[in-house]
Each structure stands twice: as C-alpha cells, then as structure tokens.
Amino acid sequence: METAAESPPGYHHGNLREALVAAGLAHLDAGRSPDFSLRELTRQVGVSANAAYRHFASKEDLLIAMALEGFRRLTLEQASAIQAQASLAAGFMAAGRAYVAFAQRHPALFRLMFGRFVASNGSEELR
C-alpha cells in the first residue's frame, strides 16, 4: 500500500476543481486567450490529464465555472464600492467605477464573462 509520501506527484488533489478554475483565471490574467487546453491546466496543477474530467465534463464547463467566478468577484467588488458610499447616488457611481476598474484589471476574463461564449451558452447558472 502506498503512503502519501510514496504516492506519485499529483496523485491526489484535495481542491482540484478550485485549482483548475484558479489556473484558468491566472492564464487569462496573464494576458492569454481562453484557447488553453484542459491538459495544459492539469499539467500546471500537477495532476493527470484525465483528473479534470471528474469535475468538468468539458473545457466549456470549466469556462462556465471561470465566468461564474468572475461574476462573483465583480459582484463583491461592486458591493464593497457601494457600501463605502454615503448616498445611493454615490453608491451607484461607485458601482459603475468598480465595473470599469474590474474590466481594466481583468480584460480577458471580462471578455469571457460578457462575450459570445457566455451569451450563446445554454448554462442555467449563467442566466
């Protein structure tokens, strides 16, 4: 029986789903397009190429998870910007500035979130 110390590298990854989403987001934040392969991301994370399919049926499912994480982050940034304001009007303006700032900091993710892929995707989560 193999112990954890004897297991091959990448044999078990406790948070593989989150690690793959994070690797995909880092890929986009590095200025790259979403044209990566799941194999490329699994290599970065240190697991076998087939391990990703335990969490994502396809690359499209991973892209959906990445877009959802982008929307979650954008929502948190806008909410934080709104809460820091004294009036509704100032909060509305702050939310708009947070939206633009997010798009400027994460242009590839923003394109994924608001581009054709999400618009044409039938995912219930993205509606």
Identify the role of each PLM range.
Residues S48, Q104-R105:
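Short glycine-rich beta-strand segments
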Residues A19, A23, A30-D61, A65:
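Helix-turn-helix
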Residues N15, A19-A26, Q44, D61-Q83, ...:
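Alpha-helical structural segments
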Residues N121-R127:
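Amphipathic alpha-helical packing segments from all-alpha helical-bundle domains
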Residues M1-N15, A26, Q85:
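N-terminal intrinsically disordered/low-complexity leader segments
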Residues H106-R111:
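Short, structured loop/turn "capping" segments at alpha-beta junctions
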Residues T3-A5, R116-S120:
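Short glycine/proline- and charge-enriched loop/turn segments
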Residues S33, S58, Q83-S87, R105:
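Alpha-helical structural elements of signaling/regulatory helical domains
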